[in-house]
Each structure stands twice: as structure tokens, then as C-alpha cells.
Amino acid sequence: MKMNRILLLLLTFSSAIHSPLHGESLVCQNALKDLSFLEHLLQVKYAPKTWKEQYLGWDLSKSSVFAEQKLRSEDNPSTSFCQQVIADFIGALSDFHAGVSFFAVESAYLPYSVQKSSDGRFYFVDVMTFSSDIRVGDELLEVDGQPVAEALATLYGTNHKGTLAEESAALRTLFSRMASLGHKVPSGRITLKVRRSSGSVKDVRAKWRYTPESVGDLATIAPSIKAPQLQKSMRGAFPKKESVFHQSSTLFYSPMVPHFWSEFRNHYATSGLKSGYNIGDTDGFFPVMGPVIWESDGIFHAYIFPLVDENGRSHNVGFIRIPTYGWQEMEDLDSIGTPPWEEFGKIITLFSEKTEALIIDQTNNPGGSVMYLYGLLSMLTDKPLDLPKHRMILTQDEVVDALDWLNLLENVDTNAEARIALGDNMEGYPIDLQAAEYLKSFAHQVLACWKNGDIELSTPIPLFGFEKIHPHPRVQYTKPICVLINEQDFSCADFFPAILKDNDRALVVGTRTAGAGGFVFNVQFPNRTGIKSCSLTGSLAVREHGDLIENVGVEPHIEIPFTANDIRYRGYSEYIQKVQKLVAQLINNDSVIILSEDGSF
């Protein structure tokens, strides 16, 4: 059936070459057809559609008409123009999971990282070049004559709400543009007005590190396209399906990451821009929080340090950074070495013996695998943790997946049989009969929803059937935990603090997470607008009391933004002192935080 649909699309594109509509160019014709496909995809499969209508005032029909009119506004549009229109069309959803990537290589960047302080100023926190008039700690005042806030406003999506996460996304794009994400890519020189720590103000001229486009524009080759000729002896051959097990393109096989992550990750690698401020960086940007008395030599940045409380007593505290839940993307990962979840377990076992509390840094985390997330969480509790449920958009795709799972697990009645069918673990989550029963329950719920017509934002269902995360059979950290979060925590990194907070298992501090609240599905389809992939949200996660994560994010128990001093001098001393004070309270007050009437501690 899928092959038939692909053939139909190919025939449609072929006929479009030779049958111009209303005098439109070939590029415009193709873009209009691709826009129509994406509109249908949103109508059928985009779970937050109703939520976006309520939250943003977004309307699919109006948005589609606007994009169509914009495509037709150019007499002979370039492919890049059409890509920007389509990127804006999906970008209007204000959804970190939803986006389009393109087959394009044009890009430009400046080797700087900028961070905003709690008083609204912008500071350079990393300079990734040896030849620059800009220094770490300089304040950024203007970009090509525009105040920074105005420059960022030009980079927001259509329906932005001005959240910290949206502002961080614009700030990330300020010095890094990629045509593969539908950006307009600058070249040449740019003027940055900066203020030194001495107070002096200076204009600095910087040159974009520019890579030109080398994928030829369809508009330039369209006149040369010839009608295909088939020889009579040619026969069609359909590829045989390699496996009887259905390979879904949606729920079970797509990582939960923001739409831009793949392109940015590739940009980090190819540009050589190694920085602790990069999303997913192993070490992160915090300095060590005290004298290190033990440190891991593996792929996790982890150590133990002594924390002295206000009474002069010393307590050993563990620190571990979780840079990503996409464990296969971890830096320095040895594919034939110890899996990350096993190394995490060894560290947590040591922390259980040697520490009185644990600090987990998951700032700037792009998300990843939900089962890996569950696996790590299973080691941080001795009691089951309740999980958010998901309201799903169901298609035949999920129905066939459900049938496959039931077929696989049909005769599983013991722990041993569960492990034979599924393995000893699923990306770190220990497998037993309970896990198999969860998966079977999920399959039955999907089939019941389909049978009852409950397919448009279904009754809330536990993702994969997992109603709870059960404690790991061997590794269980039971002491106080403090989790550090920020507005660049996406998807699984939204769920991690949500689960710990909703179960009263950890103190969550920092700033509100990004709010990418659902599972992700990716779609590739034949096209000549250069669309590589479209990523969309396939569910709406619902927390306890009916709270959503999408667009809302996860609010910390205690908000601790970065001050100007934290950022300017990169020591984050004021932030760290507050975290240390809170952790000392957790240790001394049996995990209870005492706040004064004004909310201070």
C-alpha cells in the first residue's frame, strides 16, 4: 500500500512537469503540492491541533491559505524561497517537535555563545576562536545597529508567546543560520556593539563563516528537464519486505527530540564549535561545585564534593550530568563498551554508598529515547513512579504495531519468557513480566480505541502501557535529589523533571523547561522542494490534575535564574551558592525545604 502511494506521488510530480497550472513555475507547482501534503498530514496526524487553536489562535485552513498566497506572490520563486515559506508554515505551530528540514548546505555562523541574565542583558559566555576582538564577559548591545531584543524579534516564529524557551531558540539562531532549517542565510560582515567590563563601548566587525549553497536550484534546471522514456522490455520490480514485523515510522522508532536537533548536532560536529553551552554537551557549562574528592573517568561527567552547611558540618554530595537521553549520541561512547545505563548504574551505586544527596544537571538537554529515560529514572527511586499519560492520534500504523506487539508477546507468561522475547532490558529499563504486560496492555488499549472510534486525541493512555516506572532490581538511590533544569530542556528532558516533581521524588530548581510535550513522528516523502524530513508531535502528554507539558513546560519548585554576575564571570557563583544552600536543607531537614514568607530560602 505504501509503495502504491509513492508511485502515485511520483506520477503526480511527473505530470506536473509537463502540465503547468495557471502559468505557475515548476518550482511553485511542486511547492504547492508539498504544502497540500503537509496540510493533510497536520489534519490527520498532528495531535496538538486543537490545543494550538486554543493556545495560539492558530487555524490550519487560514495558515495554509496564507502560505499558498505567499508561494504564488513570486513570479519565478527560487527553491530556497519556497523552503522558507514551508518552514514558516510549520513554524507557526510554535512546537519544538514540529519542523521541516531540507536538502540544503548553505549556512553561516559566528563562533560565539551568548546567554541572557536575569536582568535582561546579554553576555558573551564563549568565544570559539583565537582571533577576535570579543572577549568572554563582554555585553552584547546591538547587532547591525539593532538592539539585541529587536534583532531577536526578527527570528521568532509567527505565533510566539515570548517564553524563555522561544527567546533561547532565537538567541541560538542569532549567530547560527542554516538553509537546511529554512533560515535566511547571511554572508559578509556584521557589526556587533559590545560593552567591555571596564564600561567602554566598542563596535566590532565580524565576518560570517559562510558556506555557499551547492545543491542546484530546481528553478535553474527546470527548462532542461526532459520527459522520461521507458523501454518496452523494462519490468517493474517491487522490493520484498525484509521482515514480517511492521516498522512504524511513528511511535516506536522516533526519538523524542526537537525538530532542529539533527541539523544542529551536525553543525556542531562539522564546524568544530566545541562548547559547554552547546545543547547536549557532555560536561555542560557549570564549573565544579566544590573540591572534587572522586570523579568518574567514563562518559558521564560525575563527581563527589564536600558541601559545608551553615552549621559547619560537611556532607558528601554527588553530582552527575545527563547531557542527553539520546544515549547513542553521547560523546566518547564506545559502541562495544559498557552501555551508558550500566555506567550510570555503577555511578549511582557508588553515590548510594558515599553521598548524602545528589545533584543532577540536565540543563541544555535535547531529549531522546523514552525507554532510556525510564531506565535512568528506575535507578533513582525505591518506590514506583507514576507517569504522564498520552492522548494520541491513531492511524492504521499504530494498529498494526499493536497487533505486532501482541503477536510477539502472545505466549509470554514468566520473567524468563519476557526476557527471551524482549531482551534483558530495553535501553536500560529492566525487562520482566510486568514490562511485557505493560506493552500488551498498551496494544490492547490502542486496538480498543480504534474499534470504538476514539482516534482523535484518544482517551489518555500510558505511553507503551507503562503506568509506572518500577524501581531497578539492583540500583536504587533513596537519598535527596536536586535536579537543575532550564528553558533548553526538550521532550524527554521535559518529562524527567515532571515525573520526579509529580512523584515528590526530587527538588526541581532553575527555570521552566521548553515544553515539548508528546511523542514525535517523522515523515519523509518524495518531493522536489528539497524537503528532507517533516517532524511533528503525535500525542499530548497529560500530567496529574490534567496539566499539559506542550508549550507550558515544567515549572521548577524554586526558580533560580542566572544573574549578570553568574554569566559575566562564568563562575555561576550566585547560582551555585543557592543550589548548595537548598541541598544542605534537603540533607538536614529530611528532604524538606523551608521558605520564608517572601519565598526566599
From Swiss-Prot:
Protein name: Uncharacterized protein TC_0248
Example GO BP: proteolysis
Molecular function via GO: endopeptidase activity; serine-type peptidase activity
UniProt source species: Chlamydia muridarum (strain MoPn / Nigg)
GO cellular component: outer membrane-bounded periplasmic space
Record-linked PANTHER family: CARBOXY-TERMINAL PROCESSING PROTEASE CTPA (PTHR32060:SF30), TAIL-SPECIFIC PROTEASE (PTHR32060)
InterPro entries: ClpP/crotonase-like_dom_sf, CPAF_PDZ, PDZ_sf, Tail-specific_protease
Protein family per UniProt: Belongs to the chlamydial CPn_1016/CT_858/TC_0248 family.
